[in-house]
Amino acid sequence: MKNVLIIYTGGTIGMTRTENGYAPQSGQFRRAMEAIPDLYAEQMPRWDMLEMDPLLDSSNMTVHEWNKIAQLVADHYDAYDGFVVLHGTDTMAYTASALSFMLEGLAKPVILTGSQIPMCEIRSDGRDNLITSLLIAGAEEVHEVCLYFGGKLLRGNRATKFSADGLIAFLSPNYPSLADAGITIRYNESA
């Protein structure tokens, strides 16, 4: 069975309702994940989660956090078969691109994902993005930094955000998707 490390940086996927709107709360997202039975299904990889401190809105993500994420991957590289980075959507494409150059020569997947709607909401896109990212990170088809969102696996340094309110928020206009997730996950061998 494959082992995947989830690095939770903050962002919409893990936010909860507060008096002042949505906000990330330390420890809350782990409890929410523990209540999703599909994350423990037989076909899922085993996973552990590290929560960054502080949790950030991705508009506050800087080079310092990119270095921290890259160092976490390096520090845990031998213990895991793949990595999922949960990240806010505002700067996810920038982080994916930066990490793709910082982590060159990978033999394992590093998949960035998040959501447009928090997991605490009934219509959240986060559940599918998380589950599919874990499946891809636990597979052997991808060996690079990628961004998975809305059914598409995109090369990390070719993704761009094009919608702030649609559930298909990222595109790769100048490079084909690496995989498409529908009923099955279809990897694009020619990409």
Placement of each model-derived feature along the sequence:
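Buried hydrophobic positions in well-ordered alpha/beta secondary-structure cores of metabolic enzymes
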Residues: 10-11, 84, 133, 151
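Gly/Ser/Thr-rich loops at beta-strand to alpha-helix junctions
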Residues: 11-13, 88-93, 152-154
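Accessory alpha-helical/coil subdomains and C-terminal extensions
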Residues: 2, 7-11, 17, 32-41, ...
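Internal gly/pro-rich beta-alpha loop/helix module
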Residues: 112-182
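Short Gly/Thr/Asp-enriched flexible loops that form oxyanion-binding sites at enzyme active sites
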Residues: 86-108
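Short acidic/histidine-rich motifs immediately flanking catalytic phosphotransfer sites
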Residues: 78-82
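Short glycine/serine/threonine-rich phosphate/pyrophosphate-binding segments
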Residues: 15-16, 91-96, 126-130
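ATP/NTP phosphate-donor binding region
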Residues: 1-74
